[in-house]
Amino acid sequence: MQDAIQAGLGVLSSVQYVELGAIKIFSDGALGGWTAWLTNVYSDDKGNCGFNIHSTAELERIVQDARKYRLPVAVHAIGDQAILEVASTLKKYPLPNKWRERI
């Protein structure tokens, strides 16, 4: 994100072959690899509920950094716990313009 900002890119600005639409964040993994972050354990992998890639504090910092530049975020969140965490963070730090977030 910092490189894009330093290059003067903002929402829908572009350079050759690249257009910035949102800051992409990965919050968890995938269901097939048992890494999507769930509120309950996987039925076929007891003791495993997946994991979050960023702590709550790290996720909030990334979103706050995007907000400094009025950038929306697009978040990969597959598991229900990941979706809850991301939705809570986005509600806490709303986007101050017309652009839309994506989960």
Kindly label every feature range from the protein language model.
Residues 1-80, 84, 88:
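Metal-coordinating catalytic core of metallo-dependent amide/deamination hydrolases
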Residues 18, 98-102:
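Residue-level recognition of the N-termini of beta-strands and the immediately preceding loop/turn
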Residues 12-13, 92-99:
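Short helix-capping segments at alpha-helix termini
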